[in-house]
């Protein structure tokens, strides 16, 4: 979870500055952390033709960007277009991870079209299988968001991210425009719904940013992922598989101090 005011991250908040509602019922916070837990970060790079220059920009400053991480943090790298491939397994060797980013667009035959939702689901499942217990989990996708949701709705993607306990963050390059959320008549065939990483990031409590230059934005997003808040409360009894809605907001006192603050938190979860 992240709290921002304008373009700035709001730091220094405590457990008492937050209110958590589960199906509109207040929940006591039993654990609170701010940037202390190790992070498992999966970098998910769109390597379709139009994206190569942006990955090259990131590669030039990758070592500085990954300096925002800590020694216990781990990084994995996946690439995608039509298919998805693991470029680097999870590693705590951050210098090597930075070096590997430069080669992420080479030696991979992942097709020519772009399947964003499929790639995010593959990344979520990889995270669930390989991240290991403990720590926070985050995916950072770099894409131009030019794709359709073939055979995978946003709801299905969000469910996979929820199962993997993973937050999606996005750097969206180029001239991509955020699509409207589909209404009942807008896209009669869900296979041709435009991809919407903006919506996916927001629903999982992540952040997105549009960027003409990817290198500086990459470093900023890494830092913001590293300094997120983590709140824990006990799940109320409910039928397994039921979707439960969550609202996280600042307390009245915190709202007075930060009147224009925005809380970026997941909007719900599926009961276990």
Label each PLM-derived region with a short phrase.
Residues 1-272:
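Scaffold/interface architecture of coatomer-like assemblies
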